[in-house]
Amino acid sequence: MNNYLVNIDDPVLNGGQKAKNDITRFLTEDGFKELNIPIVIHPEDKSLGAQIRKFKDGLITIPKAIKKIKDADNIVFQYPIYSTFIMNKLIPAIKKNTHANLIIVIHDVESIRMFQDGGYQQDEMNILNAADLIISHNQFMTDWLNQQHVNAKIVNLNLFDYYNPQQLNTNNSFDKSVVFAGNLAKSEF
């Protein structure tokens, strides 16, 4: 099988990128080929230059890149990428230029996390409904997606883990340890 992982560059290297990097690592170790699309997304940049770049990327860069993997059987994409415009160009390019199954691995659902207005939520659910398969964190997320009328097949990961190259130390005492799985910069403590 020809399995591909499509990646979009993320200029903001925060804790959210760690999970995506780990999925990339695990899938490439399992034989997936990477297709890195050279798009830099700065969600806060609303300048004319940024809008022109986004337009060019959506109409030229993405279709050109996707045409390189016409032989794909499965394409995995890690969601979100923080640009609805780019997502709305990427998914149709995959559907038009390949016969691959589109598998979306969800890291965050922005409608839950930040944008709770109906318009954004509907756009996000349309994106997710374009998938042939969604990999969700757990049953709670899956139930929420089903309540929002996401009809794609959903599989629960049921485990959220990071790659750690360190040898497991079984002699540690965890009497006063704190383990925080999140972005410290966004935390209020």
Give residue ranges: language-model regions.
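Helix N-cap/beta->alpha junction signal
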Residues: 16, 79, 108, 138-139
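Conserved catalytic-core segment of nucleotide-activated headgroup transferases in glycan assembly
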Residues: 170-189
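Short hydrophobic "strand-cap" motifs at the C-terminus of beta-strands
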Residues: 8, 137, 180-183
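A short, histidine- and acid-enriched strand-loop-helix "catalytic/donor-clamping" loop
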Residues: 102-118
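Donor nucleotide-sugar binding/catalytic pocket of nucleotide-sugar-dependent glycosyltransferases
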Residues: 132-146, 150-167
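Membrane-proximal helix-turn-helix segments that form the acceptor-binding/catalytic region
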Residues: 66-70, 92-101, 117-134
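N-terminal pre-catalytic "stem/leader" segment of glycosyltransferase-like enzymes
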Residues: 1-89, 95-101
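Alpha-helix capping/helix-boundary segments
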Residues: 82, 140-142, 185
